[in-house]
Amino acid sequence: MNFWYHLCWWLCRVGLFFWHPVFRVTGRDRVPAGSCIFCANHSGMAGPIWILLALPEKKMIRIMAKQELRRVPFVGWVMEKFRVIFVNRGAHDIAAYQQCIDALEQEHDKMLVFIEGTRCNRDKHVRAKTGGDVVGVT
């Protein structure tokens, strides 16, 4: 278990209680016990946090994120502590795909993939990128 992940998870849970006390999630009982991939829309900066807090897992959930975020001060450091899998979106990043497959098959982790590949306005329809589907069928 990752100390930083759990510390941040609990701090966010407490913050969420005060910031948005009515937080209702349905369907937690349908999340499989083993490894799986969650595909989500990315409509805002807090989206990944909301999703992680909504899931019933206490175990760290692996996230795929664009490679450029690794260079953002502090954010990149936090993401590395959370074992984020960074993806070069401009190429077929075989190493990132292999990390995802290993996380699912060997470590039995759950993964969170923002299938549109970027943040999008809720009113704007964006086609899903390829990549998340490749990991899912491998």
Residue positions per predicted region:
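N-terminal membrane-anchoring alpha-helices
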Residues: 1-24
